Design a protein with these regions (language model features):
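Conserved SAM/SAH cofactor-binding pocket of Class I
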Residues: 2-86, 96
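A generic alpha-to-beta junction signature in SAM-dependent methyltransferases
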Residues: 11, 103, 107-109
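Short glycine-rich anion-binding loops that position phosphate/pyrophosphate groups of nucleotides
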Residues: 25, 88-91, 123
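Conserved beta-strand segments of alpha/beta enzyme cores
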Residues: 41, 66-68, 114, 133-136
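Non-DNA-binding regulatory cores of transcription-related proteins
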Residues: 72, 99, 121-124
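A short, conserved alpha-helix within the catalytic core of class I
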Residues: 92-101
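Conserved beta-strand signature within the Rossmann-like core of class I S-adenosyl-L-methionine
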Residues: 107-122
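Active-site capping/gating segments
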Residues: 120-158
Length: 158
């Protein structure tokens, strides 16, 4: 769960901000972020029905009215969002291709609208291939657990 909350150490979401969690799996990072930012609106998207069923149950059990789980491939979405969050779904160039057109320009939080992505390892080459300017935040700056040693939040504005 701390891994998911590292995003909140980088960016706080404003009231009414629309956040898309791509490949949400069991609800990370969208569930912890929806708890932390009750005035923001989260869409948790995954193409696997079983995973979305879990997120639906968790959201209902926690009373998260600001979280909407959707069983969908993100490439087919037509809605636009202020921020896109995700956790190691695919290579960054492919990910950016999927979601860039879904991002609204503007600023609905402490950073301009954009992508906040959780990923580990050496990302320099992968990020360069996107053609975007990225800001890399090492998670050990926020949390001292050994698990986070190579983990990062990477951000690029729309």
């Amino acid at each position: 769960m701390l891994h998911s909350l590292a995003i909140a150490k980088v960016c706080t979401f404003g009231d009414g901000a629309r956040i898309l969690d791509v490949g949400c799996g069991g609800g990370f990072p969208s569930v912890p972020l929806a708890i932390l930012f009750p005035e923001a609106r989260f869409t948790a998207a995954d193409s696997i029905r079983k995973k979305i069923t879990v997120v639906e149950g968790v959201a209902a059990g926690l009373g998260l009215t600001n979280l909407t789980p959707r069983c969908v491939r993100v490439e087919t979405l037509t809605e636009r969002f202020d921020y896109v969050v995700s956790r190691a779904v695919t290579a960054m160039p492919e990910f950016v291709g999927w979601i860039w057109s879904r991002l609204e320009k503007g600023q609905k939080g402490s950073l301009p609208n954009g992508i906040l992505y959780l990923k580990g390892g050496d990302l320099a080459e992968e990020l360069a291939l996107t053609g975007k300017r990225w800001h890399v935040y090492d998670i050990p700056r926020f949390f001292g657990e050994e698990f986070f040693e190579t983990k990062k939040v990477v951000y690029t504005p729309r």
